[in-house]
Amino acid sequence: MNHSETLFEQAQKYIPGGVNSPVRAFRGVGGTPVFFKHAEGAYLYDEDDRRYIDFIGSWGPMILGHSDPRIKAALHAQVDLGVGYGAPTAIETEMAKKVCELVPSIELVRMVNSGTEATMSAIRLARGYTGRDKIVKFEGCYHGHVDSLLVKAGSGALTLGVPNSPGIPASLAEHTLTLTYNDIDEVRETFRQMGDQIAAIIVEPVAGNMNCIPPVPGFLEALREVCDEHGTVLIFDEVMTGFRVSLGGAQGFYGVKPDLTALGKVIGGGLPVGAFGGKREIMEHISPLGPVYQAGTLSGNPLAMTAGLTTLNAISEPGFHDRLTEKTNRVKDGFKAAADEAGIPLAVQSAGAMFGFFFTAEPSITRFDQVMACDVERFKAFFQGMLKEGVYLAPSAFEAGFTTAALSDEDIEFTLAAARKVMKTL
C-alpha cells in the first residue's frame, strides 16, 4: 500500500468521501486519488516523492505555475504585516483598480471569497436590480454549488451523475430555466415567450465544466441582443475563463460585453478569492449603496489581495498570453496527432490557455448531449495510463485542462511522448 492509499483510507474516517471537493475522489476515473505534498513550477510531487507534470493547476488558478517566487515573496512580506484586519486596506483598492483596467465591462467590483460566492451574489443582484425572479442557465454549465444554479449542472455534479442535487426546494428550482448551450434559436424562443419575466442569463462564455466547449459564432452576440431587447441582465461566469482565455477574459477574446461578470481562480493567485463586478448602474444596487445585501468576513483580506494582485501584474506582461496559448495548442494538437497515429477517434478543442479532448468520432463538440455520448471508459483508461507515465490530467472526462507559464518545451515533449505510448494501448 502506497502513502496515498494509506492517507485516503485515513481521510475517509473523518471527511465525507475522504475529500473536500467531490471530483478529487477519482470516482470519475477509478482508483485511489493521489495525495500531494509539494509543488513547484509545472510539477506536483506526491507523498511517495513521485513527480507529475500538472495540467490541472489547482483547477485553474496556478497560471504562473506552482510556488512562483514573486507570489511567495509578496505573501511573506504581507504575513509580516498581518494576515487580516476585517477593515479596509489600500491593497483592496489597488486590486479593484487592476480588475477594472483589465476587464472591459467592469466599472465597479466587489471582492468575495470564491467563485460560488461571486455567481450567487451576481444572481441576487440581477434579481434585485430587475425585480424579476427567473434565471436562464445552460445545460452542463456549472456556476458553483448555489441552490438555484445546481440544476442540470456540469463539473463534479456531472462527473458523479447527479446534476440535480437533492436538498434544493422545487419552489426555488422552478425559477431556473435550463436551455441548450450554443442553441441560439432556443434562446430566442424562450425570450419570445417569457422574456419580461427573466432577470438574468448566466453563462460560461467558454463552457469548461463539461470539458472545453467554446461558443459557436454568434452565440454570445445573440445572448447580448436578447438581454438588451428584454431588459435582462447578462452575466458572464468567468471564474474559469477570466484572465486565462485572454488578459481581458473571454469577453475580451470574443468582443462581447456582459452586464455583470463573476471571477475566481486566477484572480486569487492560488488563494481563495472571487469577485463580481460590472456596470456602475447595476453595482450601485449593492449595499452599502443600495438595498441588495452582500457581505463577507474575509472578503478582500490582504493575503488574498496580495497574491491576486501579484498574479495579475505578472500576467499583464506583453506576450504572456500569446506564449501560453501557443503551449496549449501544442499540447492539444499533440494529443490529436497521437490519437490519429493510434487510430483512436479524438476531438480536441481549446480557448486560450484551456483545452479539452473527447473520445468521439465527431469532429467538434458544441452541445451537452454530444459530451454525454463520448467514450468515458476510454477516457478512464487514458487518464490512468497518463498518470502512470507521470502526467496529471483532470480526473474526469467532463473537466477542462489548463496550461501554466512554467510548462517547458521539455515538459510538453514528455507529455506528448506519454500520450503516444498510452494511445497505442487503448
UniProtKB/Swiss-Prot annotation:
<dbReference type="InterPro" id="IPR015421">
    <property type="entry name" value="PyrdxlP-dep_Trfase_major"/>
</dbReference>
<dbReference type="InterPro" id="IPR005814">
    <property type="entry name" value="Aminotrans_3"/>
</dbReference>
<protein>
    <recommendedName>
        <fullName>Glutamate-1-semialdehyde 2,1-aminomutase</fullName>
        <ecNumber>5.4.3.8</ecNumber>
    </recommendedName>
</protein>
<keyword id="KW-0663">Pyridoxal phosphate</keyword>
<comment type="pathway">
    <text>Porphyrin-containing compound metabolism; protoporphyrin-IX biosynthesis; 5-aminolevulinate from L-glutamyl-tRNA(Glu): step 2/2.</text>
</comment>
<dbReference type="InterPro" id="IPR015424">
    <property type="entry name" value="PyrdxlP-dep_Trfase"/>
</dbReference>
<dbReference type="GO" id="GO:0030170">
    <property type="term" value="F:pyridoxal phosphate binding"/>
</dbReference>
<dbReference type="GO" id="GO:0008483">
    <property type="term" value="F:transaminase activity"/>
</dbReference>
<feature type="modified residue" description="N6-(pyridoxal phosphate)lysine">
    <location>
        <position position="265"/>
    </location>
</feature>
<dbReference type="InterPro" id="IPR004639">
    <property type="entry name" value="4pyrrol_synth_GluAld_NH2Trfase"/>
</dbReference>
<dbReference type="GO" id="GO:0006782">
    <property type="term" value="P:protoporphyrinogen IX biosynthetic process"/>
</dbReference>
<dbReference type="GO" id="GO:0005737">
    <property type="term" value="C:cytoplasm"/>
</dbReference>
<keyword id="KW-0413">Isomerase</keyword>
<dbReference type="Pfam" id="PF00202">
    <property type="entry name" value="Aminotran_3"/>
</dbReference>
<comment type="similarity">
    <text>Belongs to the class-III pyridoxal-phosphate-dependent aminotransferase family. HemL subfamily.</text>
</comment>
<dbReference type="InterPro" id="IPR049704">
    <property type="entry name" value="Aminotrans_3_PPA_site"/>
</dbReference>
<comment type="subunit">
    <text>Homodimer.</text>
</comment>
<keyword id="KW-0627">Porphyrin biosynthesis</keyword>
<keyword id="KW-0963">Cytoplasm</keyword>
<dbReference type="GO" id="GO:0042286">
    <property type="term" value="F:glutamate-1-semialdehyde 2,1-aminomutase activity"/>
</dbReference>
<dbReference type="InterPro" id="IPR015422">
    <property type="entry name" value="PyrdxlP-dep_Trfase_small"/>
</dbReference>
